[in-house]
């Protein structure tokens, strides 16, 4: 903690407290989140759980995942230093929008915004799933945002699990409203459980209410195992309703995986737009890699928003001209998104590039 100054508590968890801190030794006084965990009296199982979280944070470095910066041990406390997301949680954004809706203004998020958020989460999950990691607690509270509310970052890997290539987990864990049927029924589960949770998040973004809610846990579980939720409103297009329906299939073999969704015509235009912009996101502070030449060339050859024209199976797809583009397979994620520009390159290009990121 010698390099950081505490500002305020921003969260409390099962093992510790999360502090917003600022750096002492750099001119910018960079703000970070430091999770302080009291290790005194911990059981071996609890220590392994904490170490697992640190290892996963190191392993999943990605522009759309909260970045790991450092860790330290001091006075029987383990400190995990992570990126700070100024925009707060997606849960707070939904609650604010719900308050507007409840004031009889009937304001929902534009479907384009919802699908952009959805695709960002999908890309981050793809990065995790390719590493055989299941998040296990995907929910709006664990999705953070930048100050402009344009970039989402997955967070809170305290209960994430790394699977073997052919294994499945069986521990019942996660937030009740977003649990998949297989977890509720104590059946083995895998990455498809994250897809169910993603469907719940998508439903909530569209409807501003939880897909599965009830007065008590048994009532919630019963709704989940039967996939019984209120129908989406008329403000949601049929294509997006079908997307939610597919994600909330009770049988995992009927539920799409990440790679299937990344090639879906409904998602593809947003995927291309995000691919064009992610090279402009600052990489995590620990990422010392040099900018990728292939990344720069891809950013130059992809169209910009000013040169795009409408494309869609759905009227809600963003403006995109795809006739000369080859759809990108999902496996390019790990290579394409792992690269970033250096600070000098970003400074030089900032005046020339107008990006939501």
Curated annotation (Swiss-Prot):
It comes from the Eukaryota. Its cofactor is Mg(2+). SUPFAM superfamilies: Protein kinase-like (PK-like). Residues 281-357 are annotated as: Disordered. Its EC number is 2.7.11.1. Expressed in hypodermal cells including in hyp7 syncytium but not in seam cells. Residues 4-267 form the Protein kinase domain. Disruption phenotype: Failure to shed the cuticle at the end of the first molt resulting in an arrest at the L1 to L2 transition stage. RNAi-mediated knockdown results in a less severe phenotype characterized by a failure to shed the cuticle only in the middle part of the body at the end of the first molt. In hyp7 syncytium, RNAi-mediated knockdown results in the apical membrane accumulation of lrp-1 and mislocalization of several components of the endocytic machinery. It catalyses: L-seryl-[protein] + ATP = O-phospho-L-seryl-[protein] + ADP + H(+); L-threonyl-[protein] + ATP = O-phospho-L-threonyl-[protein] + ADP + H(+). Keywords: ATP-binding, Cytoplasm, Developmental protein, Kinase, Magnesium, Metal-binding, Nucleotide-binding, Serine/threonine-protein kinase, Transferase. GO terms for molecular function: ATP binding; metal ion binding; protein serine kinase activity; protein serine/threonine kinase activity. The active site is at 137 (proton acceptor). Residues 281-290 have a biased composition (Basic and acidic residues). It is found in: Cytoplasm. GO terms for cellular component: cytoplasm; nucleus. The keyword Acetylation does not apply. One of its GO terms (biological process) is molting cycle. It is an enzyme of class 2 (transferase). CDD domains: STKc_Nek. Residues 293-327, 336-357 have a biased composition (Polar residues). ATP binds at residues 10-18, 35. The keyword Nuclease does not apply. Probable serine/threonine-protein kinase required for the completion of molting. May play a role in endocytosis in the hypodermis syncytium. Belongs to the protein kinase superfamily. NEK Ser/Thr protein kinase family. NIMA subfamily. This is Serine/threonine-protein kinase nekl-2. It comes from Caenorhabditis elegans. The lineage of its organism: Eukaryota, Metazoa, Ecdysozoa, Nematoda, Chromadorea.
